[in-house]
């Protein structure tokens, strides 16, 4: 595991976008060789998406041969609702790049058979050859996607009933009316993300500092689902300075001392970055 500590959230967005760009360009995708990317929603990845759009507009990266799989979607929320994850992804990322809509995969929370929808999503990931790089953010309680505290660490894509804390946290997106927040969602499982060849976790803000501490300084615990990625052979966590407030001083010093190695992860012409991310 690598922990990349950067000064601000803006640097997290820029650094992570450079890393994703390098991974895709080094992969050299083409008509018979697609790069498969797992993507999150929420405020945390917005800086990543803005920078990837910028790099695309500058001609530094193409998404023509990239397939994407999103982490989650609300149940019974129309696709064109401003808080649906379909709307979020198209508004904040997909419509600004050259990705083919047929290569975009987002769970359908309005499917007539939700279980079948989840199973089909897993099948599509397998048919695509698995996910090369899965990007995620976490909540203050360490959840990833809608895998909330207590979720199985080998779970697959499924229907989840949302916890009261999640409903209360998300009410701000629905006019602070908790009755309007969807009570269920479709989500990839922890096991689904663990199957990816590489996992990148973005952590921003002091309110997520305790979750980062649980993620890297304590043991694997299903009450902190992000901790599962300690056991992934290629995990890279990228955080801002505020998110390190609960870490031990020696932990922060250790990872900051590796900053020269971390810079090589986004340098042109550097070797297979996954070898540097163990």
Curated annotation (Swiss-Prot):
GO molecular function terms noted in the UniProt entry: glucosamine-6-phosphate deaminase activity; identical protein binding
Catalytic site positions: 72, 141, 143, 148
Pathway the protein acts in: Nucleotide-sugar biosynthesis; UDP-N-acetyl-alpha-D-glucosamine biosynthesis; alpha-D-glucosamine 6-phosphate from D-fructose 6-phosphate: step 1/1
PROSITE patterns: GLC_GALNAC_ISOMERASE
Keyword Hydrolase among record annotations: yes
Annotated catalysed reactions: alpha-D-glucosamine 6-phosphate + H2O = beta-D-fructose 6-phosphate + NH4(+)
Keyword Cytoplasm: yes
Keywords, alphabetical: Carbohydrate metabolism, Cytoplasm, Hydrolase
Any Gene Ontology CC annotation: cytoplasm
Cited InterPro entries: Glc/Gal-6P_isomerase, Glucosamine6P_isomerase, Glucosamine6P_isomerase_CS, NagB/RpiA_transferase-like
A Pfam family this chain is assigned to: Glucosamine_iso
One biological process term in Gene Ontology: carbohydrate metabolic process
Known EC number: 3.5.99.6
Subcellular localization: Cytoplasm
Function: Catalyzes the reversible conversion of alpha-D-glucosamine 6-phosphate (GlcN-6P) into beta-D-fructose 6-phosphate (Fru-6P) and ammonium ion, a regulatory reaction step in de novo uridine diphosphate-N-acetyl-alpha-D-glucosamine (UDP-GlcNAc) biosynthesis via hexosamine pathway.
Listed HAMAP family: GlcN6P_deamin
Record's subunit section: Homohexamer.
NCBIfam families: nagB
Protein family (similarity comment): Belongs to the glucosamine/galactosamine-6-phosphate isomerase family.
Protein name (record): Glucosamine-6-phosphate deaminase
Protein source organism: Aedes aegypti (Yellowfever mosquito)
Lineage: Eukaryota, Metazoa, Ecdysozoa, Arthropoda, Hexapoda
This protein's encoding gene: Gnpda1
């Amino acid at each position: 595991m690598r922990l990349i500590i950067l000064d601000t959230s803006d640097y997290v967005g820029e650094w992570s976008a450079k890393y994703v760009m390098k991974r895709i360009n080094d992969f050299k995708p083409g008509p018979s060789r697609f790069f498969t990317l797992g993507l999150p929603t929420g405020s945390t990845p917005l800086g990543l998406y803005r920078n990837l759009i910028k790099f695309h507009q500058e001609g530094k990266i193409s998404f023509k041969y990239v397939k994407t799989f999103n982490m989650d979607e609300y149940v019974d929320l129309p696709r064109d609702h401003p808080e649906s994850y379909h709307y979020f992804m198209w508004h904040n990322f997909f419509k600004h790049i050259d990705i083919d809509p047929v290569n975009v995969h987002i769970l359908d929370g309005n499917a007539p058979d939700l279980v079948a929808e989840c199973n089909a999503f897993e099948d599509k990931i397998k048919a695509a050859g698995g996910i090369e790089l899965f990007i995620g953010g976490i909540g203050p309680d360490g959840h990833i996607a809608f895998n909330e505290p207590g979720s199985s660490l080998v779970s697959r894509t499924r229907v989840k009933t949302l916890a009261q804390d999640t409903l209360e946290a998300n009410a701000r997106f629905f006019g602070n009316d908790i009755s309007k927040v969807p009570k269920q969602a479709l989500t990839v499982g922890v096991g689904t993300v663990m199957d990816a060849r590489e996992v990148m976790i973005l952590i921003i803000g002091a309110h997520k500092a305790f979750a980062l501490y649980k993620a890297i300084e304590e043991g694997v615990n299903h009450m902190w689902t992000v901790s599962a990625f300690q056991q992934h052979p290629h995990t890279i966590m990228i955080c801002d300075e505020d998110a390190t407030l609960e870490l031990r001083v020696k932990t922060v010093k250790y990872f900051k001392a590796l900053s020269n190695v971390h810079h090589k992860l986004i340098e042109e012409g550097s070797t297979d970055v996954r070898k540097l991310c163990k």
